[in-house]
Amino acid sequence: MQQLPIEKYSELLTKKQQKLTALLAPFNAPELSVFVSPVQNYRMRAEFRVWHDKGDLYHIMFNQQTKQRYRVDCFPIASLLINRMMENLIPLLKEQEILTKKLFQIDYLSTLSNKIIVSLLYHKTLTEEWQAAAQALKVRLEKLDFDVQIVGRATKQKICLERDYADEVLPVNGRNYVYRQIENSFTQPNAAVNCKMLEWAIGCTKNSSGDLLELYCGNGNFSIALAQNFRKVLATEIAKPSVAAAQFNIAENGIDNLQIIRMSAEEFTQAMNGVREFNRLKGIDLKSYECNTIFVDPPRAGLDPDTVKLVQNYDRILYISCNPNTLCNNLTELTKTHRIEKAALFDQFPYTDHMESGVWLIRK
């Protein structure tokens, strides 16, 4: 992996700031708050293909322009923990053929709390013999002071030696929040910038009245931190593992005013409007919620037209976006009813064109 252009970090970030400012200008956005990233070792997860070469074994990636593969022995954007694991794991794997045969990918998920999950992906069925070898590997890594979980994956097969999650601890405004992160589920890749996003969101919603609704809350990353600013919080999520992690996180952080329901945004809209009833909502009185603030963090495609209409029903909208172009598409409609009170750029992905942004909208 080539060295990072650290000396150009500020210049590259300024270009992003200028680009986002120009995109938001038609919507009368205030001056951007800009949140910087660490200049290296900021990424908490990484995925690599594995190359087998005459008895040798190493991580590879592909050049996005030329599609040529290149060897990766260290990865400066990834956490120090991932780099140390990469260095130690490969020699240990090579000692046991059953662990390297048909191995085609290695995924790493690390935490600020110094835990790491290593997922080994295979083009073969995993046997008890593989499991025994993987267990021996885990013991060897633990002797090297790694707090490690190993997960084996193959077609229609997943083997956890102990567990498939790691508990992250994020410092936010002087308080530590525990977040259970599940292997192969979405987590924010840049933990340092995630903490800044949470602090910004808490600052926007301070002194809020009423309740908060969050669509697609994942493991509760935002709703758990924001719960302090609201009477009650209602959050939806469709992925079962994320719901389970969110329930753990609610209990672990002592949050008593947050309810997670497993349903899509469309289903939730039907339930709120009384169009149909859902067994999943038994015991939850939707009418007891006075949600006048809504939080959305949609995928790159942004909000679909129906969800935009739903969101416009709320007096205050907190919108986190990973794609400024689709954010602006949505703002064309949203700014007909709301004005942008605050706007922010979060440098989740240094040295790339990707921009994570946030807008805080208030009804006109």
UniProtKB/Swiss-Prot annotation:
The protein's UniProt keywords, in alphabetical order, are: Methyltransferase, S-adenosyl-L-methionine, Transferase, tRNA processing
Q: Which residues participate in S-adenosyl-L-methionine binding?
A: 188, 216, 221, 237, 297
Q: InterPro entries attached here?
A: MeTrfase_TrmA_AS, MeTrfase_TrmA_CS, SAM-dependent_MTases_sf, TrmA_MeTrfase, U5_MeTrfase_fam
UniProt catalytic activity: uridine(54) in tRNA + S-adenosyl-L-methionine = 5-methyluridine(54) in tRNA + S-adenosyl-L-homocysteine + H(+); uridine(341) in tmRNA + S-adenosyl-L-methionine = 5-methyluridine(341) in tmRNA + S-adenosyl-L-homocysteine + H(+)
Alphabetized NCBIfam families for the sequence: trmA_only
Active-site residues are: 322 (nucleophile), 356 (proton acceptor)
Supply the enzyme class, top level: transferase
Domain of life per record = Bacteria
Please report the name of this protein according to its UniProt entry.
tRNA/tmRNA (uracil-C(5))-methyltransferase
